[in-house]
């Protein structure tokens, strides 16, 4: 073989190898491109050529979706469900420790998650009543009509009827919330709204606010549950109206008046979304309300989330933003109350006002919960009647049985708060509320049950009914004790846990007892004959040196003055008292004076006086309860 022949062969082989390399490289890039397209597109193998391009949507539909900006999407791989909900590796409340194993998975299979798009903002109809959440002004010549219509629903129905069903609202979110990133795929939700004789405009404004301000892909359906309404327009007229809505909406009806609890259970039975979102029938959802709720649940399906509940004025329908620094608690009589978030929880959140807030209890009207978890944890207590107490029962159950309850500051929903209910209840409101509270006490309060009965004389007479099924549920879920709840979830609770004495405080000379007399904040503490029935005569002398009854503490601002009942602030000062168990006197730290029995001038009011250590300044503290904290 000549050198030239050898050279030609080598060149031919090199060209052949080069072609192979080029072909293989091209094939690799084609495969890589296909993988990328399949990874980031929902169109492949689904709607194919019908998929819309960025920025395209049906302009004739006012509620059509717009594409999320790229910087507002979070890739699915960024969701780390192995960490705690705060992104921490540890903490006092870690899921799965000490609770029943098994049950639903903590996370969702990817196949059920949907890619979503931001809902467009509702544009202001300038000059129209109530736009941008502004108050409605009723003309002077319509005041009488306004007062008459107010009686129908205990809110200004005339003002509501003047406002568009699609009224605009300001974006009330914290600036940091508007920059939040959420997962690009989230679970769908079904909205369940129970109503009874609701006004047409408030009910449909609730529905339209859901439709207008929710990512359409995440909104599975809206379920309206009519709890035996008697108004004609809530019958066929409502069914025909909702049938034309751009989101699947239908009406279920109870056969007889069932109450909120059982009506919600009926609605939940028909839910087809992954998450149930319960709303009241007189709400308005704001921009970006839904995504933060679902984004939290997608991280952990055992998290139950609530929006911040803003106020819609019952007089003017003005939209008023609520504080993001309050959480849910309860008092000695198991009444739900809003209290300021303690510094402990603020520190856990690194003082980030946009971070999820762990709340001891929820108001109960508005929240989202994974559908399977709702049933796994026992849904609602079907032994409860109508309304009242179900929010505390579910709150205790969530925390004690391994779940987490949060308020999501980046989600805002307005609610029409009324001074009184326009509805009547079979047997009366008090009977129903006490029955429900008794069921809560019997199942969840453990040894604090007797304390609750001592504080609420009506509850002692109320029948809780058969609670064996609910106790069995608690055993099956291996739930924690109420003491664990107070020590770990709600150490700021007003329920007596950390105290020296709990019971009546009796004057040695007059044999009369300190008594709140049913008075309210900033009124004087009283004194009356000792009746031994608990209630207004139960006081706790705490290890913070407070003398408290429920959320009221004895407070003295000046020497020789009266002693008032002021909301406990846990900061000492005017509310700090020292009890000498041997001498039996109660000395006020700030003034150095002692608590003395009432005088003839005012036989019902104890006073502060210089300490004389006489019998009129001696007080007997005897604990009635045996389960004091160690």
Swiss-Prot record:
Q: How does it sit in the membrane?
A: Single-pass type II membrane protein
Task: Spell out where the chain crosses the membrane.
Answer: 21-38
Region of interest (Catalytic subdomain B), ranges? 356-418
Q: List the disulfide bonds.
A: 177-410, 401-479, 513-530, 553-568, 594-611
Q: What is its main location?
A: Golgi
The organs and tissues expressing this protein are described as: Expressed during oogenesis, in the somatically derived follicle cells that surround the developing oocyte, which are involved in the maturation of the oocyte and construction of the egg shell, as well as playing a role in subsequent embryonic pattern formation. During embryonic stages 9-11, expressed in the primordium of the foregut, midgut and hindgut. Expressed in salivary glands from embryonic stage 12 onwards. During embryonic stages 12-13, expressed in the posterior midgut and hindgut. During embryonic stages 14-17, expressed in the hindgut and the posterior spiracles.
Q: Provide the protein name.
A: Polypeptide N-acetylgalactosaminyltransferase 5
Coding gene? Pgant5
């Amino acid at each position: 073989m000549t050198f030239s022949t050898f050279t030609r062969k080598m060149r031919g082989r090199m060209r052949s190898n080069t072609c192979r390399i080029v072909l293989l490289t091209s094939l690799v890039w084609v495969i890589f491109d296909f993988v990328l397209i399949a990874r980031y597109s929902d169109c492949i193998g689904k709607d194919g050529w019908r998929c819309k391009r960025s920025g395209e949507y049906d302009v004739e539909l006012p509620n059509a979706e717009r594409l999320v900006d790229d910087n507002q999407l979070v890739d699915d791989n960024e969701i780390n469900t192995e960490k705690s909900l705060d992104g921490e590796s540890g903490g006092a409340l870690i899921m799965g420790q000490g609770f029943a194993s098994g049950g639903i998975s903590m996370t969702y299979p990817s196949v059920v998650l949907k890619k979503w798009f931001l809902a467009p903002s509702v544009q202001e109809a300038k000059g129209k009543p109530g736009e941008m959440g502004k108050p409605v002004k009723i003309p002077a010549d319509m005041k009488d009509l306004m007062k008459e219509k107010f009686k129908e629903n205990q809110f200004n129905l005339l003002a509501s009827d003047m406002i568009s069903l699609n009224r605009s609202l300001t974006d009330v979110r914290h600036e940091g919330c508007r920059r939040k990133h959420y997962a690009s795929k989230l679970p769908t939700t079904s909205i369940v709204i129970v109503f009874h004789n609701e006004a047409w405009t408030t009910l449909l404004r609730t529905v339209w606010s859901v439709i207008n301000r929710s990512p359409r892909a995440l909104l599975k359906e809206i379920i309206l549950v009519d709890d035996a309404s008697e108004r004609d327009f809530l019958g066929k007229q409502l069914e025909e109206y909702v049938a034309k809505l751009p989101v699947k909406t239908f009406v279920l009806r109870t056969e007889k008046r069932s109450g909120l609890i059982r009506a919600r259970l009926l609605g939940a039975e028909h839910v087809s979304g992954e998450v149930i979102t319960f709303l009241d029938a007189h709400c308005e959802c704001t921009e970006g309300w839904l995504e933060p709720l679902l984004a939290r649940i997608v991280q952990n399906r055992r998290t139950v989330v609530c929006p911040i509940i803003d106020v819609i004025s019952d007089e003017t329908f003005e939209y008023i933003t609520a504080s993001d620094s309050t959480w849910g608690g309860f008092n000695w009589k198991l009444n739900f109350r809003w209290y300021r978030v303690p510094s402990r929880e603020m520190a856990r959140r690194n003082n980030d006002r946009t971070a999820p807030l762990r709340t001891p209890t929820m108001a109960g009207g508005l929240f989202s919960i994974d559908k399977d978890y709702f049933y796994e944890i026992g849904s609602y207590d079907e032994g409860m009647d109508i309304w009242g107490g179900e929010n505390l029962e579910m709150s205790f159950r969530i925390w004690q049985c391994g779940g987490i309850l949060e308020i999501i500051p980046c989600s805002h929903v307005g609610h029409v708060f009324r001074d009184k209910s326009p509805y009547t209840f079979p047997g009366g409101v008090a009977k129903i509320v006490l029955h429900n509270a008794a069921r809560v006490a019997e199942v969840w309060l453990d040894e604090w049950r007797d304390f609750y009965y001592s504080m609420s004389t009506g509850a002692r007479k109320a029948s809780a009914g058969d609670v064996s099924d609910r106790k069995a549920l608690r055993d099956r879920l291996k739930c924690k004790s109420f003491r664990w709840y107070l020590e770990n979830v709600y150490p700021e609770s007003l329920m007596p846990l950390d105290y020296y004495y709990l019971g009546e405080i009796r004057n040695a000379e007059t044999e009369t007892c300190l008594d709140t007399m049913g008075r309210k904040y900033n009124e004087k503490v009283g004194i009356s004959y000792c009746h031994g029935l608990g209630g207004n005569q139960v006081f706790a002398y705490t290890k913070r040196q407070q003398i408290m009854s429920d959320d009221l503490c004895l407070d003295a601002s000046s020497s020789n003055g009266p002693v008032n009942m002021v909301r406990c602030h846990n900061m000492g000062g005017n509310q700090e008292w020292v009890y000498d168990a041997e001498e039996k006197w109660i000395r006020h730290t700030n003034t150095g004076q002692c608590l003395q029995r009432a005088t003839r001038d005012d036989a019902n009011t104890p006073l502060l006086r210089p300490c004389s250590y006489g019998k009129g300044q001696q007080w007997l503290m005897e604990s009635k309860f045996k389960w004091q904290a160690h």
